[in-house]
């Protein structure tokens, strides 16, 4: 079956049939994986993955999203079976929680806050900072004994900063073999370091992304919390499956996929969509009244 045939494939309805596919089209649609960016912001290299343009916005071909997701799953599972280690990277607001959660679930290292330059290319500097982190934690346990209150406050601030930036990588003993990136535009520095160290890169590609930055890309919305949660969790499922663990989303059917509750409503260009205020027109006397729909007859 080629990609065009997949576009016209019938919807799967039975629970058992859904478990034969990595994820249903319905869940891809529900997660908003198909929303791209404004057409004016696109990267021409993403043209093969764009289905259409609607109201000035590119629509991603979810048939290709699902096909790429399945391939990436098998690729990651194969690496994991061979004992590869992974690093999850996602420093944008929408990706932080799922990146951290799935990295911890798979016993992988992760960066969900600021990427520290040299994380992969200057291990000596990073290890020195990790040692400083450990020393400050010991000082905190002692109540900063022997130091003034002012010095204790300064130590606490430095400790909080180091914990925020280093917690996900403090146990890194060697370089990972595979990097999973939530947004290739936001975390270009991480990608460049991975390229220098010949680390395989698997990333989500929105319509404004450069697919040449990764070894394998998954065309999908990288701004939606639901989209990121769905894709990152499925990729993590591949690592878990290689170790005979329980999968959460991949090949589990629609009923198993529950998206996180969030008040954030992220638009296709990374901006929160704010509800439109109802239109009102001003009366001559200065009061306001709602505008009636012209198609509705007024009740007399």
Swiss-Prot record:
GO terms for biological process: translation. The keyword Ribonucleoprotein applies. One of its GO terms (cellular component) is cytosolic small ribosomal subunit. GO terms for molecular function: structural constituent of ribosome. Residues 261-300 are annotated as: Disordered. Residues 282-300 have a biased composition (Basic and acidic residues). InterPro entries: Ribosomal_uS2, Ribosomal_uS2_bac/mit/plastid, Ribosomal_uS2_flav_dom_sf. SUPFAM superfamilies: Ribosomal protein S2. Keywords: Ribonucleoprotein, Ribosomal protein. It comes from the Bacteria. The keyword DNA-binding does not apply. PANTHER family: 30S RIBOSOMAL PROTEIN S2 PROKARYOTIC AND ORGANELLAR, SMALL RIBOSOMAL SUBUNIT PROTEIN US2M. Belongs to the universal ribosomal protein uS2 family. This is Small ribosomal subunit protein uS2. It comes from Mycoplasma mobile (strain ATCC 43663 / 163K / NCTC 11711). The lineage of its organism: Bacteria, Bacillati, Mycoplasmatota, Mycoplasmoidales, Metamycoplasmataceae. The gene is rpsB.
